[in-house]
Regions:
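Short, strongly hydrophobic alpha-helical membrane anchors
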Residues: 1-17
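Functional transmembrane core segments of multi-pass inner-membrane proteins
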Residues: 24, 114, 124-195
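Membrane-embedded alpha-helical segments in integral membrane proteins
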Residues: 2-7, 97-109, 155-161
Length: 195
């Protein structure tokens, strides 16, 4: 059992750990469904919030019960319910991957007794990285919409949780983070100049 003051306060008994792990996985799959929207729309410079999702071939608006993470793709056999157009396996895979990653993040937070608030940051970084990777795979681009937030988080987090980088002080953690940021910036500049 864990007895720590906030943010190290875990308000659940050991026998509830399985339940919360399941919640983390399900929450991750729901986020993964949203990431699929981002992966499709960001490269096309479309809003990620509206309009609702639809089939790119026939324009059929996806109903809520056709958009349940993992289950809908499975029951629809990877096809649009109206026109039968194939739905990429990537949708299922991203939902599953995000669910598994959120579960692993949650287990690390719990078993390493890290601040619960840190889970939110890890979740956010996971979302950004997954979105960036799959956009890069499909379009060979790394969008600013995901790159800049990752850089910001990388610089800001050490000021709040220096232990993320295994440092004792915020200054040490920030220096390590800034060094990584500088290297990434130089690489981006080099690739940009190389065309």
């Amino acid at each position: 059992m864990y007895y720590y003051s906030w943010p190290y306060n875990y308000p659940f008994l050991p026998e509830m750990m399985g339940f919360w792990a399941f919640v983390a996985f399900v929450f991750g799959t729901c986020i993964g469904s949203f990431l699929n929207v981002c992966i499709w729309r960001i490269p096309r410079e479309e809003s990620i919030f509206s309009p609702p999702s639809r089939c790119p071939k026939c324009g059929h608006w996806i109903r809520w019960y056709e958009n349940i993470p993992l289950l809908s793709w499975t029951f629809l056999r990877g096809k649009c319910s109206q026109c039968g157009n194939r739905i990429s396996f990537r949708y299922f895979f991203v939902e599953l991957l995000t669910g598994v990653m959120f579960l692993l993040v949650w287990l690390r937070i719990i078993f390493e007794q890290k601040p619960l608030a840190l889970a939110i940051i890890y979740f956010a970084v996971t979302m950004l990285v997954i979105t960036t990777v799959f956009i890069d795979i499909e379009h060979r681009i790394i969008p600013d919409e995901t790159t800049y937030p990752v850089m910001f988080v990388g610089l800001a987090v050490p000021l709040i949780f220096p232990e993320v980088w295994g440092r004792d002080t915020r200054l040490e953690a920030f220096i390590v983070s800034f060094a990584g940021f500088a290297v990434a910036l130089l690489l981006m500049l080099a690739f940009s100049l190389a065309g």
